[in-house]
Amino acid sequence: MKIERAYTIVTAPGRNFVTLKIVTDEGTYGIGDATLNGREMAVVAYLEEHVIPALIGRDPQRIEDIWHYLYRGAYWRRGPVTMSAIGAVDMALWDIKAKVAGMPLYQLLGGKSRERVMVYGHATGKDIEACLDEVARHVEEGYRAVRVQAGVPGIASIYGVAKKPGERYEPADAELPAEHVWNTAKYLNHAPKLFAAVRERFGDDLHVLHDVHHRLTPIEAARLGKEVEPFNLFWLEDCVPAENQESFGLIRQHTTTPLAVGEVFNSLYDAKALIENQWIDYIRAPLTHAGGITHVRRLADLAGLYHVRTGFHGPTDLSPVCLGAAIHFDTWVPNFGIQEYMPHEAVTDEVFPHDYRFEDGHFLVGETPGHGVDIDEEKARKYPYRRASLPVNRLEDGTLWHW
């Protein structure tokens, strides 16, 4: 069996997605998600110019060798563009291998470690009361875990808060980056009030998560983590910029609130010190951006040695292809923690038919050979790419800040 051709499919059913399709000389094909939010076409160019030509004629079942060929052989290693391209190839090759074996992907990985995969949903609101209403809706739909994000008085735009009740939050909503204004003091004063209100209304059984989105300094994050301990958060996510790994050691010294990080990571080496020093509790690197199943398996294995669990990034800017593969991975991985879930728009699901199911706050993995997600290329052609950029943040004095 040889790789006969490979090509990218760029489509925007609800938002932009990049899909890599690899076809063998025997007619079996696999698909992988190559979407990098706001930088989609950079990955397309990397795949088309540097990766696809090197794949033709190779044995698609030699997944490990191809991974190292693309990683080591490129010399210019790591980075989100390179690793998203490798991740897409790897995902597609595992899809092919599982189809050839006639097995769902999780069986090739080692079989089930659990019967279902717990997910967390996103509850947002312009104020605390509106956020509580969204939490209630999620609870009614069966969610056992909910991320809460609410508007802050005096700040016009808050990360994670949808523009209207019931809408999906989509930050990449302008052709060029919108500029938001941030005030740390107002946020720190308001956030604990949100968690107190959630606990007062919903009690202690609901898993409550929150995303700071890299906005704080280490000592500010330590203060917040300490202050919210009475509310027993499932995790506090991305409380400081992820580049400063040692800062998590400082935060850990001050609080027992569980810490999660990693959605911007694209390599095992980004997380190595965090895991080995036990500065975090959950690693969030997604399959697409972190080099695919082959590399994330190594990351999860390392994490498991130090009692760090997975909590993969899973917003709507990763396509159902990545989500489907992640559900298979979650079903297998021993040190699973939780899976992020933002439902895609109906039109997205039409373009990407899949066999995974959401039920009672959990995903149930499908039994279709492969990762269980396909792409309808005819429908995909109806939704052309449109440039969309993530925002930037400034402090009130104009200083550029972390978004």
Curated annotation (Swiss-Prot):
PROSITE patterns: MR_MLE_1
Molecular function as annotated in GO: gluconate dehydratase activity; magnesium ion binding; mannonate dehydratase activity
Pfam families found in the cross-reference section: MR_MLE_C, MR_MLE_N
Annotated substrate binding sites: N37, H122, E263, R284, H313, D317, E340
Site description Important for activity and substrate specificity, residues in chain: P315
Top-level EC class: lyase
EC number: 4.2.1.-, 4.2.1.39, 4.2.1.8
Record SMART domains: MR_MLE (SM00922)
Co-factor requirement: Mg(2+)
Reaction it catalyzes: D-mannonate = 2-dehydro-3-deoxy-D-gluconate + H2O; D-gluconate = 2-dehydro-3-deoxy-D-gluconate + H2O
Cofactor remark from the record: Binds 1 Mg(2+) ion per subunit.
Keywords for the protein's UniProt record, in alphabetical order: Lyase, Magnesium, Metal-binding
Binding-site positions, Mg(2+): D211, E237, E263
Any one of the GO BP annotations: carbohydrate catabolic process
Active site: Y159, H213
Protein family according to the UniProt entry: Belongs to the mandelate racemase/muconate lactonizing enzyme family. GalD subfamily.
Protein role: Has low dehydratase activity with D-mannonate and D-gluconate, suggesting that these are not physiological substrates and that it has no significant role in the in vivo degradation of these compounds. Has no detectable activity with a panel of 70 other acid sugars (in vitro).
Protein name: D-galactonate dehydratase family member RspA
Organism the protein comes from: Halomonas elongata (strain ATCC 33173 / DSM 2581 / NBRC 15536 / NCIMB 2198 / 1H9)
